[in-house]
Amino acid sequence: MDKSFILNKTSPRSSARRGQLLTAHGQVETPVFCPVGSQATVKTLTPEDLKSVNVNMILSNTYHLYLRPGIPVVKEMGGLHKFMNWDGVILTDSGGYQIFSLANLRKLDEGGVSFRSHIDGSTRYITPEDAVSFQQDLGSDIAMVLDECPHSEASENEVLAAMERTHQWAKRCLAAHTLKSQHLFAIVQGGLSPVLRQQSAEYLASLDFPGYALGGLSLGEPKDITFETVRHTLRFLPENKPRYLMGVGAPEDLLEGVSCGVDIFDCVLPTRVARNGAFFSRLGRLNIRNASFATQKGPVDPECNCYTCRNYSAAYLHHLFRCEEILAYRLATIHNIAFLSNLMQEVRTSIEKDCFEEFKGDFLTRYQPTNESVRIEQKQKWLSARSGETSS
């Protein structure tokens, strides 16, 4: 496909954008949040569950599928869409971030990256050309280049080297990409340096990719730094191409990202916290394990109309989590994905009506975000845990 994006409107008082992402499996209204299905499934949900909450785009991960069941198996099954019985849009990550997360288990050179599988310890080597070939065999609608994501404490020289390697790999990925029905997105790196972020954005923009992602952010740095970097970087990317902020999914962060001019988001957060008993609501996250929910007859979120809130009391959900029943994780996940899907629909409508800033302000007046210092500590612990495994 030649055209990847239609920009319909930009807010007159911010950089919020309303558009459509054009793919071989349909049109996606933007701004959009994509649930993550790393291993060809959004954990605990069926494709029908996703459609019921108006999700038509998900992310899957090439790294996981490469290791298990293997790219040839998925290709033999007719590609990723048929393999998982999903007729919506699929974005595949190249696996660069997952390999980065392996820390001591991987080694980089100019040709590619070698790493030890977190499953069986076997040594693998992936080149940029391999990453493209794998994603073409998967048949995703949007593929990502292989990039190097420097760790959050990397030196300036290390960040520069990672950026330059990412640029060279991006050129190789672009040269190797031949599947016309698939869009290949570049990934901007550069750490938290405004100078390097500008250099990366300008260089990748000169290569004329169908879309651009911002990588290497939301890795434990303060949120104000994250979005300062996002705003700065987007100034140097083309307005007529989609912008994708990787790894961001908290409600307050989605609103801030939209106000910066981001079109696409993904994150494991809503599904991961759901399995830990955290339910999104207009007031903030609610911990269903708290004793206050043990006898609550009404739904956990009275303002929500999802399947979970229509059919089950907070007391029942509290009981399921206390007993560690599998149904608990499924019902919580349905709710959190529905919450974000509805939130993004409201965002799109508010941009159309020129009242996004009021909507954002009203939402954040009521919503209580997670404590920032606690959030950073939790993020660092999660990243450390991922050094030896990559499950989402």
From Swiss-Prot:
Similarity comment: Belongs to the queuine tRNA-ribosyltransferase family.
Disulphide-bridged cysteine pairs: none
Origin species: Dehalococcoides mccartyi (strain ATCC BAA-2266 / KCTC 15142 / 195)
Presence of keyword Chaperone: no
Pathway in which the depicted protein is active: tRNA modification; tRNA-queuosine biosynthesis
Protein name: Queuine tRNA-ribosyltransferase
Region (RNA binding): 247-253, 271-275
Cofactor binding note from Swiss-Prot or TrEMBL: Binds 1 zinc ion per subunit.
UniProt record, GO biological process: queuosine biosynthetic process; tRNA wobble guanine modification; tRNA-guanine transglycosylation
GO CC annotation: cytosol
Gene3D superfamilies referenced in this protein's UniProt entry, alphabetically: Queuine tRNA-ribosyltransferase-like
